[in-house]
């Protein structure tokens, strides 16, 4: 709609509702680029236009976070399909990455000042996004200066040590024995 005021209003309402229920974080907005009509998450994404995503995400995030609730921008990055989403390789070149897939996330970090960000399930350049050094360290923390919290999508981490070393702060597990399994030696010594 390009209506930034309505986006800010929506963010305020979401933030108020979350705060009223005692919630500290909203797992939104989802700002991936809509690339295929078959993507099962299109209903939660904003647009196929990276500029529109950037323009609408910033006031939405600000509206949420003005209510003392953190917005968790997701799914970083290149999460544009549901088929084989846990292991699909997103094969895009650097230009497409920078011009199409990252502008919304960059705006969310630099202008929206989002406090949290969620990694994606898919792979990029051979590494899962939830522990991808290039995305998390080089771009997100290095270039953009993000100092907030990065969490994984549920079950999105395939190497806990690599995730911790590459900048993931919180791993969301799908198993009930996560602590016993993943925090066994030698990882426990590093935490």
Language-model segments: what does each one mean?
Residues 1-191:
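Glycoside hydrolase catalytic-domain context in secreted enzymes
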């Amino acid at each position: 709609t390009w209506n930034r005021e309505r986006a800010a209003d929506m963010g305020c309402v979401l933030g108020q509702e979350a705060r009223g229920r005692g919630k500290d974080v909203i797992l939104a907005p989802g700002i991936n680029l809509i690339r295929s009509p078959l993507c099962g998450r299109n209903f939660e994404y904003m647009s196929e236009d990276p500029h529109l995503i950037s323009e609408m995400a910033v006031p939405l995030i600000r509206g949420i976070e003005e209510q003392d609730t953190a917005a968790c921008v997701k799914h970083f990055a290149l999460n544009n399909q549901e088929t084989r989403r846990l292991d699909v390789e997103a094969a895009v070149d650097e230009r497409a990455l920078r011009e199409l897939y990252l502008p919304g996330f960059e705006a969310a970090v630099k202008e929206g000042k989002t406090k949290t960000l969620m990694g994606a399930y898919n792979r990029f350049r051979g590494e899962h996004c939830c522990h991808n050094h290039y995305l998390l360290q080089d771009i997100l923390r290095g270039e953009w200066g993000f100092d907030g919290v990065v969490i994984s999508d549920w079950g999105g981490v395939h190497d806990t040590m690599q995730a911790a070393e590459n900048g993931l702060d919180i791993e969301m597990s799908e198993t009930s024995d996560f602590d016993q399994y993943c925090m066994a030696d030698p990882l426990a010594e590093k935490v």
